[in-house]
Structure formats: C-alpha cells, structure tokens
Amino acid sequence: MERSAVASGFHRNYILCASRAATSTTRLHSLSSLRNFPSSSLRIRHCPSPISSNFIVSEVSRNRRCDAVSSSTTDVTELAEIDWDKIDFGLKPTDYMYAMKCSRDGEFSQGQLQPFGNIDINPAAGVLNYGQGLFEGLKAYRKQDGNILLFRPEENAIRMRNGAERMCMPSPTVEQFVEAVKTTVLANKRWIPPPGKGSLYIRPLLMGTGAVLGLAPAPEYTFLIFVSPVGNYFKEGVAPINLIVETEFHRATPGGTGGVKTIGNYAAVLKAQSIAKAKGYSDVLYLDCLHKRYLEEVSSCNIFIVKDNVISTPEIKGTILPGITRKSIIEVARSQGFKVEERNVTVDELVEADEVFCTGTAVVLSPVGSITYKSQRFSYGEDGFGTVSKQLYTSLTSLQMGLSEDNMNWTVQLS
C-alpha cells in the first residue's frame, strides 16, 4: 500500500506530463508545456510503469467532464490515507507546490509544479531582512459528484496585486494567479477532503527572494503556492468563540500596511493573541489606534455586529483588510434584503448588539458568544449563533460547497 505523504513528507516519484502514457523522464515540465490544454482539464491517475506509485497529470478531453479518477484503471489513489474525521487547521504536507520567479523589472512566466518541500533562500533575501512579502488564502471544496469548487479566486489575485503595488513588488497577472491555483489544486486532488469533512486550504505567497543588503526592493521575486487539507480554524469549530477587546496593542495605523495582506501584519498580533489565549479567550478584537473606541478587526478576520436585523461592519479605510469573505457576506446579506452598513462602529455598540460574528477565509463565518471589554463580559444569545448569522453562514457555505445554485457566479468548478 502506498505510504501517506503525511508520513513521507512528499512523493518524489511523481511526474507531470501532457500525455496519457508514462514517459521515461521524471522531470517536472513547466506550465508553458501544458498550455495546449486548460489546467482545469487535468486529473491525476495511476500511470502503468515499472516504478511503483508513479502518477501523471494527464490531459482529458475538452468535450466531456473529467471523472474523479480514471475509469480505465483500477489501481488509483482517490484520497490520501488520513483520518478525515480528525483533521484540524494545521499543515499537512501534500504532494506538490507551485513556483514561479521574476526579476524586479520583469514579468512572471514559466511557472512549474515541484514536489512539496523546503526551498533554498539567500540569507540576504528581502523577505527575510525587510519583510517584503505577501500571502493569500483561499479554499477548494469537493462536491458530492467529485468535482471541485474554488471560491472567487480572482478576488485573491486582485488583492495580491494591490498589496504588491504597496510593497514595491511585481505580481502575477490575475490569469496567471488563477491558473496556478487550478494547477496546484488538481495536482494535489487526493488531499481535498470528502464532502463535509473540511477543505483544501490554498496558500499563495509572494516574496522578495533576491539578495539585498541595503534597504531597497529585492532584485528577484518568487510566487509560490502550497496547499493543505484543513478542518475548522478555531478549536471550538462552528461553536461560538470568545473575544477580548485589546486596549494596549494595535494591529495597524493610518497610512501603514493594515489594508494589505503583508506578512508583517500577522507577526505583530502574536503577542496580544498569545496573552488572550493564555487567559482562555479565542482571539483578540482590535480598536483603532487614534481614538481607541472604533472596532477594527480580529487578528485574522473581520468583525460584524447585528442590531434589529441591521448588519454593521467597520468600513475599509486602509487599516482593515478588505476580506473576500467579508465582501461576500455583505453581498449575500443585501441580496436577501438585509440592510448592511459599512461605517465606524464604536466599541460601546457591543453592549446593545443582538449578534456578533467574524468572517474570513479560514473561519468562513464564526459566531461570537461573548466579548470582554474592560473586565465586562457581554454575551450574545443562548448559543451565540444568532438567527441572522446562522442564515448567512448557511447561505455562504452552501454556495461554497456546491449545495445551492451559484446565482452570484462566484465559484469556479474543476473536474
């Protein structure tokens, strides 16, 4: 029986080719060699070869959908050998990652898949010395029929390009980003959890990997994607979480980088988050640094409050990340007749709120059971999952998982 990649780290005997038969070479061909067919028509099947556990990513007819596995062979690997009922939100090494490079003044091209593993990087790299790096996060879901859904990947591509401009970095085009995501997901298809068991978390990275000693943009950049099957982000699952309002530390400042997904934003919240978790809280809710009375966001997700069926969330003004799940929830809520306000939300409004919830790629929509502010604890509902937040959670997750019709045209299906 084939060893799980969780134990081995990654498989070194995978090959990528554009034919239906195994070849004698194990070189990973560049993406440019596969441009004669779309990445969404790739599938992994067992390759008859004297080398055990050889797989190829093979071309599928454009005129029909691709089955989850090849019907012409019985020796296939549909799912990785892990306990899908016990996965959490943690890294589980998969088979492939995707990499693409360019110079500071150049363009990204010739990306390729390679076995998942460590990367070589110069100790003088811009990302290590000056934090010149961005990341994104999105998910792939397996449908009941075996097809795979991505959720608004072009939005992540656009957000990365906006962040790259702020950080003086070149960025892949939207088309390059989306095709790279498709290619990486399909190459790791067996790691996508069964329906209802979780999702495949996709982590695109953009880093200044060229060596630079003085403070300046790096001379070379790497775009990389790796993936991991995940369960719920919070240990509580979809149960209510408990937040504490942070009054000493701040996540972002006006004119800073709080509105882009740069890596430094997340290192900066670890101290306050660690203190909060040591006290038994799930996470931290930050206030603005000027007045210390307006809600901003949680460490890694946006915040919403509900009062009398009116939904309010802090407006995007440079210090808050423009979350894609946030944007989607707002659009879903408005399509269902809810009034949604994007405005300054004061911390005092937490006292009277009927419901509070967080949104983000990792958490999707997480109900807030309580918020503690200056030693006062405010609770929301009997179980924290209010009527409005439950309705929005169900609507969004049903759409993401392919359980309801996508009238928004947000999902991208891979066969």
UniProtKB/Swiss-Prot annotation:
Protein's GO biological process: isoleucine biosynthetic process; L-leucine biosynthetic process; L-valine biosynthetic process
Job of this protein: Converts 2-oxo acids to branched-chain amino acids. Acts on leucine, isoleucine and valine.
A GO molecular-function annotation: L-valine-2-oxoglutarate transaminase activity
Family per similarity comment: Belongs to the class-IV pyridoxal-phosphate-dependent aminotransferase family.
Native organism: Arabidopsis thaliana
Gene: BCAT5
Modified residues (N6-(pyridoxal phosphate)lysine): K261
The protein, known as: Branched-chain-amino-acid aminotransferase 5, chloroplastic
UniProt cross-references to CDD domains, sorted A to Z: BCAT_beta_family
Top enzyme category: transferase
Subcellular location: Plastid, Chloroplast
Keywords for the protein's UniProt record, in alphabetical order: Amino-acid biosynthesis, Aminotransferase, Branched-chain amino acid biosynthesis, Chloroplast, Plastid, Pyridoxal phosphate, Transferase, Transit peptide
Additional comment: Branched-chain amino acids are synthesized in chloroplasts, whereas the degradation takes place in mitochondria.
Family annotation (Gene3D superfamilies): 3.30.470.10, D-amino Acid Aminotransferase, subunit A, domain 2
Amino-acid biosynthesis listed as a keyword: yes
